Amino acid sequence: MTQFLTTAAGRRIAYHQTPGAGPGVVFLGGYRSDMTGTKAVHLQNWAESHGRGFLRFDYSGHGQSSGRFEEGGIGDWFADALAALEALTEGPQVLVGSSMGGWISLLVARALQGRVAGLVGIAAAPDFTADLMWDSYSDQQKALLTGQGWLAEPSEYSDQPNIITKTFLDDGSKHLVLRAPLNLPFPVRLLQGTADVDVPPSVALRLMDHATCPDLRLTLVKGADHRFSTPDCLDLMTATIEEVLRHA
């Protein structure tokens, strides 16, 4: 059953929680996705069958949570994730971050040291506002963003275009994790498809090279795309989480 958490910022965050043993598992979704996605629901079913505590939620402006998507940013969604973890979980947690959720997982891990027992990134996209958006734009696109404040981009996942605002990009620049030391003192596993055109494997390799971590491994899956939601990919995801839990 969907429940709601009202944060200190007044945002109403939709969530679904499965009670069970710890360390718990928390799923952090991607940009414009929600907690009814394939990976989130698959993980809930896995958690229920294994008696594992599990939390999935919608960032503000996503899914059933309050707010308009166009008015949110990395800082808001990071704050939502922190609020959800602090209010709804106890003890150590394993974070599972998909795409943008991988970036937010890293921000949470940095902020809640001692609460994070492990991290699984699925096509993790740290710093994507800078590296995969702004740096890839033409001079004309940058001029549009600077002048009118927004840019419309076609989306492969929706009939509606992505509206990218200069405010969103500027907010992202305040939360970059690959420009300063990144200490991850727990098991980290990165899962990445070789056919991912949204977040290429080079991002995972850069994260792997940048982070200081005693136990970090990257698994590349040939032919897997950004969704990483085929039955084989989902099985690999749960097997990887189980491995992290054994080492947590």
PLM regions: where:
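N-terminal cap/lid segment of alpha/beta-hydrolase-fold proteins
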Residues: 1-19
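Short beta-strand element of the alpha/beta-hydrolase
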Residues: 22-30
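The serine-hydrolase catalytic nucleophile loop
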Residues: 31-44, 202
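Conserved alpha/beta-hydrolase
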Residues: 42-66
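Catalytic nucleophile-loop/oxyanion-hole region of alpha/beta-hydrolase
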Residues: 63-88
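Short beta-strand immediately N-terminal to the catalytic nucleophile in serine-hydrolase-like folds
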Residues: 95-97, 122
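Gly/Ala-rich beta-loop-alpha elbow adjacent to hydrolase catalytic centers
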Residues: 97-105
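The alpha/beta-hydrolase serine catalytic core
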Residues: 115-220, 225-248
